[in-house]
């Protein structure tokens, strides 16, 4: 545990909330910090344990006593805090390959499981191994041991693309054993070592190059993991906006003159309106194209025939839009299909703001107080006008009368004596008993229980 001392200069609010206490059998700790508050600027963190308040041991204080102690500090608050050290994981030992890795050498013409073996066939009396270019014969004393070696062949570690013995037997039975075995190719490549003796003459077999392992593209993370303000933005009492962009015009593809196409068109034999897949035919006039042409929406056009269906402008350059089978230039498409701004009633041709089930220009949807564009941030509605979070909290935010903290969305609160209170802050000013749902008295805007109704405050 790391203990330290923090001194905050007054006046209140101090910018933090407490949780726990002797009455809860939980040590006092910091449960919440006000962003940019005095406690946050002094380095206090959520979860820090409170050891003492102005020199008094906090372990013997109840929750209410700790709050009263903090309120009584006036212009200077001294806190003794303790912070748990993060647990560091033990360093892992690096895995090092063995000094002398095993080497394998196979005969060039040997193939794995050339002929299928029935499961009940007796094993051979001895086995043949090849090591460093020499043949070694090892007798097998017992047939059951050989059978055990065959059965445990599938248990050996193999590359991810390797096939088991049972799978190769099945490939032989189904007639697919001619297919190349990736396991055999992998073992051949990994076991190539220089030989001192002259190799036996064998036919050269070209080896295919296997592509290296590809790094999988990272999957898109969910928004609540990427955006740290996701939860705050979509709180129940907030409204969010969505930014989109108006459709961008497509561009036709120009193709240069091709001699083979011109010759095929001039050679005759096909009708003027037919298209055999080699000769381009204009989709507008249905005539063979003998020169430059454009390709758009899967059809070929004479450059002068590809025009806007509304104004007749040639669309060879500048892009176009397609809507319900008709082609439009960008200006005609904006006039006819672009959405209108809910404020200025003009067409929106750039970024579109979606808010309150309407569309807006980005510069038209602004905070009613600071006139700053809200863009893709959360906002509050008050009397039919949008406000950014900062101005809304400044103008309409509700604070607790007891602890002077803001009452956030989801907090339980009550209204009494003309003020708002957290449910845990509405207590008797003398004995600190909770007065929620109970009869109480007031003196100098402070709640009192029945027992202290006539006490001096």
Swiss-Prot record:
Gene Ontology MF terms in the entry: metal ion binding
Compartment(s): Cytoplasm; Cytoplasm, Cytoskeleton
Residue ranges annotated for the LIM zinc-binding domain, each copy included: 280-338, 339-398, 399-457
Superkingdom field: Eukaryota
Positions with biased composition (Polar residues): 126-135
Segments of this protein annotated with the region Disordered: 82-166, 186-226
Gene3D superfamilies the UniProt entry points to: 2.30.42.10, Cysteine Rich Protein
Residue span(s) of domain PDZ: 1-85
Modification Asymmetric dimethylarginine, positions: 103
UniProt-listed CDD domains: LIM1_Enigma (cd09452), LIM2_Enigma (cd09456), LIM3_Enigma (cd09458), PDZ_PDLIM-like (cd06753)
Location of Phosphoserine modifications: 78, 111, 247
Basic and acidic residues: compositionally biased ranges: 144-157
Pfam families: LIM (PF00412), PDZ (PF00595)
Record keywords: Cytoplasm, Cytoskeleton, Developmental protein, Differentiation, LIM domain, Metal-binding, Methylation, Osteogenesis, Phosphoprotein, Repeat, Zinc
One BP annotation, GO: actin cytoskeleton organization
Free-text note regarding domains: The LIM zinc-binding 2 domain (LIM 2) interacts with TBX4. The LIM zinc-binding 3 domain (LIM 3) provides the structural basis for recognition of tyrosine-containing tight turn structures. This domain is necessary and sufficient for interaction with TBX5.
Name the UniProt record assigns to this protein: PDZ and LIM domain protein 7
Organism: Mus musculus
Source lineage: Eukaryota, Metazoa, Chordata, Craniata, Vertebrata
Gene: Pdlim7
